[in-house]
Amino acid sequence: MASEQDVRARLQRAGQEHLLRFWAELAPEPRAALLAELALLEPEALREHCRRAAEACARPHGPPPDLAARLRPLPPERVGRASRSDPETRRRWEEEGFRQISLNKVAVLLLAGGQGTRLGVTYPKGMYRVGLPSRKTLYQLQAERIRRVEQLAGERHGTRCTVPWYVMTSEFTLGPTAEFFREHNFFHLDPANVVMFEQRLLPAVTFDGKVILERKDKVAMAPDGNGGLYCALEDHKILEDMERRGVEFVHVYCVDNILVRLADPVFIGFCVLQGADCGAKVVEKAYPEEPVGVVCQVDGVPQVVEYSEISPETAQLRASDGSLLYNAGNICNHFFTRGFLKAVTREFEPLLKPHVAVKKVPYVDEEGNLVKPLKPNGIKMEKFVFDVFRFAKNFAALEVLREEEFSPLKNAEPADRDSPRTARQALLTQHYRWALRAGARFLDAHGAWLPELPSLPPNGDPPAICEISPLVSYSGEGLEVYLQGREFQSPLILDEDQAREPQLQES
């Protein structure tokens, strides 16, 4: 272990010697922990990190003055539309995706480094239950979708296949996530095919470039954003693991989307047939000012432009068909070839510019008292996973329906948007639509038919509660055998073992 003198000298070179100001008050064990933490901070890199954070925070916020002139929509030939393509085109995409899955060439990679702080919980988001009748967590829903897509691909091609699940965690989520998976027997996935790894942490910094102490013996650290993926892939030799398994295509997604289709064969097949090295799923923006990043081109290269960087005038622009010109909303759902990820980790990652997140960071004051600030007092520097789009040689985007594939969980109740209630509604409404399409009818408590409402307003409750296990249906397929021509009272819960139908009433 580095000595106090060594660490103090390193901190002086970085201009951060204040981190040892409580040294004399610490007992041996906290001293050792603090030294171990500080020894990991390389002086030159730390000085540069603090300088860049302070400079970035001091820069004027808002859109670059010339951005509107540099902005263009994605070329039409690089954009597919899952819902508006002809059935034969969609079938070809799906069949190619299933073929690649059956050859064990597809992996999924979950971005799960964040805690559920905005949800009002201290554990990882993936462990959250939104109130489904089955009481399933996000992690369980995702694991079961992997199992189902493996099954579907295997049945189509007469083989057994595996979709490895890579889970990027942070110091805050690795332990609870690993324990949760063990407690639930990895949701019946082979543990050898679930690979967890940690992203890096970066110190939080004051507005004048000083690292924050959250305790007398601990630096305030935060994950380096979902764009920390690329350093983490290199740190933990994840691409080498993928190569050993024969993985060529990687589906990267964020933990909080309850409707996410893992290893979606339509998306995989679309990107493979396009020859894409990098791709993104997008949804049509709900309205011009919707706070979502836009996938577009800047100076001729693909990029996600944050909503705060687009002027109201640009956001309102319309295409010739009346749709928004910049309407490709980013949903953190991406496709990469392993070769592209290798190039990013080896060549392009140092070119990624960190983004400033101004936060309320707890700290100890000069007297050593813990302070929980009421307004933002610090800077956390983050990289974004989509910042690598500009390095793609062949970028493609697939537009999907929001009501089928995107309902994020970000806010605690009683928020109007992106809450447990809206996520639960999105999934149950989707399953209700699937049941109607499969020929089910629903009855009220008196045995009368409920109205069939295949199209519901946003955040509206379906007339009947219907939950379908991902192990029964991945995207609405194969339900006729259970539901065709039958009548059910709410709630209908269709699990993998049988059609479990509480208060079932046959016609």
From Swiss-Prot:
Motif Substrate binding: positions? 111-114, 306-307
The domain of life is Eukaryota
For the ligand (UTP), the binding residues are L111, A112, G113, G114, K125, Q199, G225, D256, K380
The record's InterPro entries line, in alphabetical order, gives: Nucleotide-diphossugar_trans, UDP-sugar_pyrophosphorylase, UDPGP_fam
For this protein, the Enzyme Commission number is 2.7.7.-
CDD domains, alphabetically?
UDPGlcNAc_PPase (cd04193)
Q: Which GO terms describe its molecular function?
A: UDP-N-acetylglucosamine diphosphorylase activity
- Does this UniProt record's set of keywords contain RNA-binding? no
Give binding positions for substrate.
Answer: N226, K410
Please list the residue ranges that the record marks as compositionally biased, kind Basic and acidic residues.
78-91
Q: Which UniProt keywords apply?
A: Nucleotidyltransferase, Transferase
Region described as Disordered: spans on this chain? 56-91
Q: Which GO terms describe its biological process?
A: UDP-N-acetylglucosamine biosynthetic process
Enzyme superclass (EC): transferase
UniProt family annotation = Belongs to the UDPGP type 1 family.
Instruction: State the protein's name.
Output: UDP-N-acetylhexosamine pyrophosphorylase-like protein 1
Give the lineage. Answer: Eukaryota, Metazoa, Chordata, Craniata, Vertebrata
- Tell me the gene name: UAP1L1
